[in-house]
Structure formats: C-alpha cells, structure tokens
Amino acid sequence: MTKRALISVSDKSGIVDFAKELKNLGWDIISTGGTKVALDNAGVETIAIDDVTGFPEMMDGRVKTLHPNIHGGLLARRDADSHLQAAKDNNIELIDLVVVNLYPFKETILRPDITYDLAVENIDIGGPSMLRSAAKNHASVTVVVDPADYATVLGELADAGQTTFETRQRLAAKVFRHTAAYDALIAEYFTTQVGEAKPEKLTITYDLKQAMRYGENPQQDADFYQKALPTDYSIASAKQLNGKELSFNNIRDADAAIRIIRDFKDRPTVVVLKHMNPCGIGQADDIETAWDYAYEADPVSIFGGIVVLNREVDAATAKKMHPIFLEIIIAPSYSEEALAILTNKKKNLRILELPFDAQAASEVEAEYTGVVGGLLVQNQDVVAENPSDWQVVTDRQPTEQEATALEFAWKAIKYVKSNGIIITNDHMTLGLGAGQTNRVGSVKIAIEQAKDHLDGAVLASDAFFPFADNIEEIAAAGIKAIIQPGGSVRDQDSIDAANKHGLTMIFTGVRHFRH
C-alpha cells in the first residue's frame, strides 16, 4: 500500500526538496492552499485536500482539514482491528506522515501595524489539530513541525522505509511543546487585550537561547531561555561584539546592571557590579569622568566586574578601562576607536551593545521568582518617586548639595541587597553594606568602606531603621544626612537621635527591599 503524507506549511523553507524526496521514495502527498500551489509549481504532484474530504476549502480557509477523513486517517491505531475496520467502512485512507507548521501568530502580533482582527485571523485551528492528532498516534504516524527535522526523517525513510519509534516519540514531544507554546502566546495576547491582571492560569513560553556549560556552580546544569515575544532592552537581545559566551552568572549580573542604569538617565553614568550588587556608581558631565568616579568608588572590587555605561564609549574612556580585568562591558554604542582599543589582546572580554531607547518598555514586564513547587509574580520596583513628596523629619533641612547627594543615594540603594546601606556624595558611591541580617551591621560595613571619604557624604537605607543605634553609628562617623523610607514603630527614636546630633533626615515613604 502506498504511504501518504499530508503537507501544509506556512514556513515553506526546504519543503519543495523534502516533498520531492518523498515522491522519489514512492509516497503520495496531500496538500492544502498555498503549500499545494508551491509544490505544484515546483513540479511535485499532490492530491488536493478537498479530494480527500469531499468538501471544498471554505470560509476564507478557516475550514479545510477539520474532517473525519483527515483525522480518522491520522488517529486510527494500526494495531487495533476495530480502528482499521472503521476506516475501511468509512472509506478513510490512512495518513502516515504529517508535515505542518502554523500560521505566524507571533510574527503577526509583533508587526507595528497589527490590528485585533488581523491577530485573530492568524490563529491557526486546523494546523494544531492535525499536529496533535498525529502526535497522539506517534506509535504509527510521523509528525514534523520543524524544518530542521526534515533531513532526519528523510534519512530514516530512505534507509528503512519508516522512521523509528524513538524518532516519532521525540518528534511528538516537540509537537506538543510547539502547540503548547503557540497556545500560550495566544492566551497571553488575549489576556493583555482584556486587561486581566491576575489570570487564574499562568502559562508563559520561552525559546531556548543558549545551552550553558553549567549554572551558578559547576555541579548545576543550566540553560538560558528568551521570551517568545522578545524584549528589546534585555541581555537576551543584546548584540555581543567580542568575547566568550556569557555564563549563567554573567547573565544575572548583566541583567542587574541594565536594571540599575535605567534609573540614571539624565547624566552620563557608569555602574560597576559584582555579584548583582553595585560596587561603584559614578555620574558626571561626560562618560570618561563618570568612569573615573565609578572606578574610584571601589578600585579593588572592580576586578572581574561588570560595567554598564549609559552613553557611547569613547576612546578616552576605553583607554582607561582596557588595563583592568573586566568580565563584561555593556553600552548603547562604541566608537570605532574605542572598540579597537577594548578588543586589543582582550579576546575573552565580553562586549555587549544594547539599545537604551527601549528601556521604558522593559519596566512593565513582570518579575518571576521560582520557589519549590511554585512561582512568585510581581511587577518591578520601578515606582516613580518625586522628591517633592518626601518629608524632612528632622529640625535641620538638607543643604542643596546634600539634597542632590541624597537623591543620587536613593536611586543607588534600590539595587543593593537587603539589608542594604549605601554611602555616597553627589556624584559617586563611597561605601556599601549589603546583605547583612541586621541593619546596623550593614551600616558599619558601609562606613568602614567609606571611612576616608566621609566629608560631605550622605547615607541611604533601603528600609527603615528599627532602632536608634543605627543613627548613633552614622553620627559617630561624621555623616550628616540620611535618607530612608521610615515606617518603624520606633521612628521617633531615630528622629530624636538625628536631632541630637544635628543630622538631617528624609523619609521617602517607599521601601526598596531586594532579596
């Protein structure tokens, strides 16, 4: 009995050659619509779908393959006599191979001129149905959704006249992943259209971006996936201009870096990170000076760090960066001379180019945190804060210079691991206390780091001070200005201590925990 294949594809790459080889192997080919036209024009003889169903394609192509003569031919178990008899009684011929890929829903909704009606029309119904029927019956039917699998299938058919069960099972699994991802995108689109903020089911889909050597540690397996609807301002979308493949830890650090730099749009700014904590932030009127400040903030921790700059990297800045061992540099662009300097004898230095004009769109994405047996979802900590809404709670008001420095410190503290303390002046960070289990411990660490640069320095805390001992430590170090959220039941104790030492202190009313 001649074997039959059904081919209906929107992505026609490689399909003509595939179909020609099938014909050479003695297969009959059923086809639909544009696929049939393409194959016929290439001289590949095909059977029209309506010759199989007895019904013409109708309703602008919405109905063409949803028919028992198709799905019966796909779903009939070859090892079940009752199935084969039912097929014979109803003149249903078996279909042994399905090659289908789906309407380009993803590509459609990414179009700038997308309309709701156009999106709806690009929801494939018949394609997923055929794929699922064939995949369910993979014991007997081979199903192909990816042109990358054409060669494997043809090779096995040529060698043995059929594919192996292992291949059919692997291809079926691929189909179910594919249709699940396809439906997830449709669900995501409609959920957005109706404004549902807390859907009762959450299905998200990502595409494999990079198979990684290992994860956070060598004993951990890891891979990097990118959103099926890519975010332009994302490490996954960055263009790598030089260097080794990004590691798991590189990607996490780089992601933290591009989040931080979003908050420093107004002036040229450089941020240096280690282990997802900023160890140096500098801002100035030009990017070279901003680099100087970021480097001076912690010239020890910068070794092996990640650097992000919010302006084009020029030659002068590149010359200063080049001698230092860095893991990654990220910037919106690089001058030709700067790139030549940075790559000279630095084949491993990872240099990434990222369009910063897409920053705002990245801020609306939800954050997902995996826990054992569950998933936490929250919006990003990107609340717009207006300093005019802040409250000076002490007798002394901040000076103009202190006010500027406090605003700078408040931007920086958002990205320090809790309990987080940061000491800055108005243009660079000076000391950092991160990740301590008590706040006074973070205060002491930050002061120790900044001890030689405390003249005119200010201090920011990501959350309230639970006790006045923090204020005593700060005052003893000579720091005169503090910014914190407030909100402790003992706030008045901290205010009284600040007044006793002549400090100025601002309450913002907004906490910035980071775990």
Curated annotation (Swiss-Prot):
Reaction equation(s) it catalyzes: (6R)-10-formyltetrahydrofolate + 5-amino-1-(5-phospho-beta-D-ribosyl)imidazole-4-carboxamide = 5-formamido-1-(5-phospho-D-ribosyl)imidazole-4-carboxamide + (6S)-5,6,7,8-tetrahydrofolate; IMP + H2O = 5-formamido-1-(5-phospho-D-ribosyl)imidazole-4-carboxamide
GO cellular component: cytosol
Domain observations: The IMP cyclohydrolase activity resides in the N-terminal region.
UniProt KW Hydrolase keyword: yes
Organism: Streptococcus pyogenes serotype M12 (strain MGAS2096)
Name used for this protein in its record: Bifunctional purine biosynthesis protein PurH
The UniProt record lists the keyword Ligase: no
Domain of life per record: Bacteria
Gene: purH
Associated pathway: Purine metabolism; IMP biosynthesis via de novo pathway; 5-formamido-1-(5-phospho-D-ribosyl)imidazole-4-carboxamide from 5-amino-1-(5-phospho-D-ribosyl)imidazole-4-carboxamide (10-formyl THF route): step 1/1; Purine metabolism; IMP biosynthesis via de novo pathway; IMP from 5-formamido-1-(5-phospho-D-ribosyl)imidazole-4-carboxamide: step 1/1
EC number: 2.1.2.3, 3.5.4.10
Lineage: Bacteria, Bacillati, Bacillota, Bacilli, Lactobacillales
